[in-house]
Amino acid sequence: MDSKRLRIAMQKSGRLSQDSQELLKSCGFKINLREDRLIAHVENMPIDILRVRDDDIPGLVMDKVVDLGIVGENVLEETMLERQSQGLPTSYKKLKDLDYGGCRLSLAIPREEEWTGVAALQGKKIATTYPHLLKRFLAEQGVTFKPVLLTGSVEVAPRAGLAEAICDLVSSGATLEANGLKEVQVIYRSKASLIQADTELYPEKQKLVDRLMPRLEGMLQARESKYIMMHAPKDKLAEITALLPGAENPTVMPLASDSTHVAMHVVATETLFWETMEKLKALGASSILVLPIEKMMM
């Protein structure tokens, strides 16, 4: 690979892969991501996308093999703790928290067992893919345990007699329920992040990062925002603006044949609920339209 091309590592397959691809494409990257290729070249920018296992991404960034990485915070933190124990470099820069990949790392026990608190795990066998995060949490609680390291299907460990509890990622809890387990304690909350190697980039690469970040921030802002149009009574503008979260300096235009109302356009930065629309209507607003925003640059 050309050392002057920006290198971005992302998950090849898994829960972050598709969302990461869509995010990069929405930022204007023209990428041909074929399943049989581990390196993809962005057609319209000097950028290479490396598609790797998610638990390899933090190390690639910390070792400065790649410039940027998109990775779950759970994997990032676990890798950092592991590398600290091995005396390896752990520095990186976090550029942006992303709005997907949300999950939690939780303790779970068999459904029929009573949960009396973390102290009940003293000396027990706990199956996990995240031994360092688990060890740190339990050490803070003064609890020692016997780790059972598994790389997959952690939830079957209690039924298989391998462990008495598990520590695993949870999204909806359906997998735990299907395996006769119940979630009892969240130990870490995670979402996807964009990270950068802790080094000074070539000027050409830094220019690309400087172009990427406003696009990325604009896309994330657009996802959180709605464009709202309505007819509003002039004497209620302040109250209506106060109802719309994040609304600043709405655009107000006169209506052709109504001197008591105006057309009001505003960008609200949070979800507009039905209850809010009902309150707007109660204040005299009409013809209320709520539209998604594809792109935004502040």
Curated annotation (Swiss-Prot):
Entry superkingdom: Bacteria
**What Gene3D superfamilies does the record point to?**
3.30.70.120, Periplasmic binding protein-like II (3.40.190.10)
A single Gene Ontology MF term assigned here is: magnesium ion binding
Location relative to the cell: Cytoplasm
What EC number(s) are associated with this protein in UniProt? 2.4.2.17
Catalysed reaction(s) here are: 1-(5-phospho-beta-D-ribosyl)-ATP + diphosphate = 5-phospho-alpha-D-ribose 1-diphosphate + ATP
**InterPro entries recorded for this chain?**
ATP-PRT_HisG_long, ATP_PRibTrfase_cat, ATP_PRibTrfase_CS, ATP_PRibTrfase_HisG, HisG_C, N-reg_PII-like_a/b, N-reg_PII/ATP_PRibTrfase_C
Q: Which protein family is it in? A: Belongs to the ATP phosphoribosyltransferase family. Long subfamily.
Record's protein name: ATP phosphoribosyltransferase
The taxonomic lineage of its organism, from the top, reads: Bacteria, Pseudomonadati, Pseudomonadota, Gammaproteobacteria, Aeromonadales
